[in-house]
């Protein structure tokens, strides 16, 4: 066993590429993440009370779930759990989703991004830095897999859905200073799957998109699933879908189901919204992401 791995090697792009295999937890940042204030957030904790919750994340990580090489399609998805940017619902909106994607022949990477919200920063600011960094690191790692990465998407629930939207619309502006050569790789997702995404509407008017959401023709296609009785209004998903259509982005799909509430993840219910994984799979097939 080798113990003498230097810190520089541990965070080098070469080491990342070699070690990005199933079950490997990769730190995003070589040291403190950008903008972190030592002592602002307490020790990381994991709590299970019906829902497995992770809180106080200061050292964000990626956990790789690689599909069997006989099934692998070359498509990879970064998965972002929800939790109001306060905690992470890491199991039913994270680990379980990665395993489902593996069944489709899709590599999955679970992003444990920074929570809770940092003082004097937008709620999505630190998580967006983590997501942009993750996009580049996964692209680098995917070059060394038996089935090399060809398409990289992002999927998220609630606050994680907001993070998926922000990542898919903010790629033109990397929100941190370059760390290493991996940051030369694109942070633009090839597709996005926001599920009951939160915080999309302007806080003042509640009838238009938040001003920091910038939809252009360069945005990737989106798949949305939401419910009409969700406490997070479906209007945000609808407005982004319409903006994508207006911008000329092809291939997006929107589902608004009448019932189902919020926070269901992959859990089966009696409501039609439980069909969203099948609809998402069909959408991915229509874009040839599962070929």
Task: Name every feature range the model reports, one short phrase each.
Residues 231-236:
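Conserved alpha/beta-hydrolase "acid-adjacent" motif
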Residues 21-71:
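N-terminal cap/lid segment of alpha/beta-hydrolase-fold proteins
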Residues 129-217:
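Primarily recognizes the serine-hydrolase "nucleophile elbow" in alpha/beta-hydrolase
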Residues 89-90, 96-97, 113-149, 270-273:
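Catalytic nucleophile-loop/oxyanion-hole region of alpha/beta-hydrolase
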Residues 73-82:
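Short beta-strand element of the alpha/beta-hydrolase
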Residues 91-109:
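Short amphipathic alpha-helix adjacent to the substrate-entry channel of hydrolases
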Residues 238-241, 246-291:
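C-terminal catalytic histidine-bearing segment of alpha/beta-hydrolase fold enzymes
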Residues 223-226:
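Short beta-strand/loop motif that positions the catalytic acidic residue
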């Amino acid at each position: 066993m080798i113990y003498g791995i230097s810190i520089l090697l541990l965070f080098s792009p070469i080491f990342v590429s070699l070690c990005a295999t199933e079950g490997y937890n990769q730190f995003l940042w070589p040291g403190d993440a950008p903008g972190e204030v030592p002592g602002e957030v307490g020790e990381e904790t994991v709590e299970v009370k019906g829902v497995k919750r992770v809180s106080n994340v200061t050292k964000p990580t990626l956990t790789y779930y690689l599909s069997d090489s006989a099934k692998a399609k070359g498509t990879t998805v970064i998965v972002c759990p929800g939790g109001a940017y306060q905690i992470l619902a890491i199991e039913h909106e994270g680990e379980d989703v990665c395993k489902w994607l593996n069944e489709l022949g899709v590599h999955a990477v679970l992003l444990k991004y920074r929570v809770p919200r940092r003082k004097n920063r937008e709620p999505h600011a630190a998580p967006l830095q983590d997501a942009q960094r993750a996009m580049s690191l996964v692209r680098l790692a995917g070059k060394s897999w038996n089935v090399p990465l060809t398409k990289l998407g992002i999927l998220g629930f609630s606050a994680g859905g907001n993070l998926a939207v922000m990542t898919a619309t903010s790629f033109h502006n990397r929100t941190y200073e370059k760390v290493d050569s991996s940051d030369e790789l694109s942070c633009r997702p090839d597709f996005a799957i926001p599920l009951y995404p939160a915080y999309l509407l302007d806080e003042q008017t509640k009838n238009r998109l938040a001003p920091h959401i910038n939809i252009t023709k360069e945005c990737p296609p989106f798949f949305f699933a939401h419910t009409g009785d969700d406490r997070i209004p479906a209007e945000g998903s609808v407005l982004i879908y319409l903006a994508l259509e207006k911008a000329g982005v092809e291939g997006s799909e929107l589902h608004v189901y009448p019932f189902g509430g919020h926070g269901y993840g992959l859990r089966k219910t009696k409501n039609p919204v439980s069909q969203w994984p099948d609809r998402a799979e069909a959408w991915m097939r229509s874009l040839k992401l599962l070929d």
